[in-house]
Amino acid sequence: MIPWLEADDPFPNVSSALTEADGAPGLLAAGADLSAERLLLAYQNGIFPWFSEGQPILWWSTDPRMVLFIQDFKISASLKKTLKKIDRSMIANGRWQIRFDHAFEDVMRACAAPRNGEAGTWISDDIIAGYTRLHRLGYAHSSELWLDDELVGGLYGVSIGNMFYGESMFTRVTDASKIALAYLVRFLGSHGVSMIDCQQQTAHLASLGAMPISRTEFISLLRQAIAAPQIMDWKPIPMFEVN
């Protein structure tokens, strides 16, 4: 049994989250709301919302936790070639551009669009409204790939101190979300961020260098990261030295 949270209730300790034996590993609580204050409190404690349409708000703290250490991000030879092309395009104000926070809500809605083999989405209008509020406060950001001024891929997440929590990504052209992630990783690394929270284990994330760590280790690293000053100047930088 998990607790039901009223508006002013604190989150329970993450150690009380359900386990594999309970059938919903990582489920911590239900209820409360998606206010900016509640979302920030959740992320500061290693908790995130995830629920389907028709369900109450469900709060999770998974164990193990999937994370991407910046130094472990994998760039294939083909992706590296593409990134160099985009670097040159950015410098020359060409067809391909990377932008941060240019169309945050559009990125969220693209991430919410139905995908092959999936019946629905967890990114509801309430989720979009909640994270858009965080974006206006400077705590949620998007990394976007544009082609001929059309949004063709990207991702969004939450930033607190030196911690970035990845939420969802989408792609409309080959490798678009990987490209947006690569530029985000480059930017975050330049600002002292060492880890991106990926929440749950997937083969796709593992292929990019993400790995599972224990919740205890994650919370320890999280505490250090969120104590750092907030990153303020969100502007993409080139991946490589371009001649």
Swiss-Prot record:
Its EC number is 2.3.2.6. It is an enzyme of class 2 (transferase). GO terms for biological process: protein catabolic process. GO terms for cellular component: cytoplasm. It comes from the Bacteria. GO terms for molecular function: leucyl-tRNA--protein transferase activity. It catalyses: N-terminal L-lysyl-[protein] + L-leucyl-tRNA(Leu) = N-terminal L-leucyl-L-lysyl-[protein] + tRNA(Leu) + H(+); N-terminal L-arginyl-[protein] + L-leucyl-tRNA(Leu) = N-terminal L-leucyl-L-arginyl-[protein] + tRNA(Leu) + H(+); L-phenylalanyl-tRNA(Phe) + an N-terminal L-alpha-aminoacyl-[protein] = an N-terminal L-phenylalanyl-L-alpha-aminoacyl-[protein] + tRNA(Phe). It is found in: Cytoplasm. Keywords: Acyltransferase, Cytoplasm, Transferase. The keyword Isomerase does not apply. Functions in the N-end rule pathway of protein degradation where it conjugates Leu, Phe and, less efficiently, Met from aminoacyl-tRNAs to the N-termini of proteins containing an N-terminal arginine or lysine. Belongs to the L/F-transferase family. This is Leucyl/phenylalanyl-tRNA--protein transferase. The gene is aat.
